[in-house]
Amino acid sequence: MKRRGIARTTAMAMAAAMILTACGGGNTDQSTNAPAGGSAQTATDNGGSGEITKTDIVVAMGADVVTLDPAGQQDTTSGVLIHHVYSTLMDIDEEGNLVPDLAESYEMKSDTEYTFKLREDACFSDGTPVTAKDVKFTYDRAKDMPKTKSNTSKIAEVIADDDYHVTFKLTQPYAAFKTIVTQTNLSIVSEAAVTAAGDAYGDVENVLGSGEFTVTEWVPNDHYTLTKNEKYWGTEPIATSITVRVIPEGSARTIALEAGEVDLVWNVDPTDCANVEAN
């Protein structure tokens, strides 16, 4: 199963995919491709079976997102949001295998050349198609951005062969390249949207991705809301909306969970784990 596919199975799994860890751990400054793993601490509305069946999910996290622009993302919290709003060329499944996302297949023509075939039905949330030009634009832009330079340093050239084929030429053989194209900070952006918005790209009204959800509201340091993308080209998620509340204090997140104010909580403090699990 694709890691992104976890979010499509049930509403509980949709929310669980947004949780890196439940008890212990913390927010790290790194790019992330599919935030999964660990066990999510949840409140349920179905008699305690452990599965959330509601479609409007409320999640408590300890920190806010930093950016809505993939090329500016290096923190995990922003990566969680970006993963659900944008798509990458490839993804990694639960077994660690490289699987298709926007690209349905790829061909390794040599140690330094890869060609990806894009899905022809993939589109951004405004209905415009995702093309090889958008992929080229994304990677060319990333080479000039401080937080994505390292990921793209071994890419010599990106060529849009036609609308749905894109070729990467590397400076040297690079075994990690196939995982680089799964990174959230290399999620594909719309050339038209970024060009039109200029420096304002990343504002809520300018964000345009091709993932399962769109960002409909962001109140910094308070909450953000994701709404199901009606133009999504993949399997429809069961969750129709996800509201993420920023609650910095760990004990306050736990209290909100136990009171039923939130359905899931990011990083239950170790001292509260036993109480949450027993409740």
Task: Name each model-derived stretch.
Residues 53-66, 104, 113-117, 135-139, ...:
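Short, well-ordered beta-strand elements
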Residues 23-39:
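Bacterial lipoprotein signal-peptidase II cleavage site
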Residues 104-145, 167, 253-256:
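Aromatic- and charge-enriched surface segment that lines or borders ligand/interaction sites
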Residues 230-275:
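Ligand-site clamp/hinge motif
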Residues 60-109, 140, 208:
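N-terminal lobe/hinge region of extracytoplasmic solute-binding protein
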Residues 107, 150-193:
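Surface-exposed binding/hinge segments that line
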Residues 149-152, 274-279:
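Ligand-binding "clamshell"
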Residues 97, 182-236, 241:
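Gly/Pro-rich hinge or "lid" segments in bacterial periplasmic/extracellular proteins
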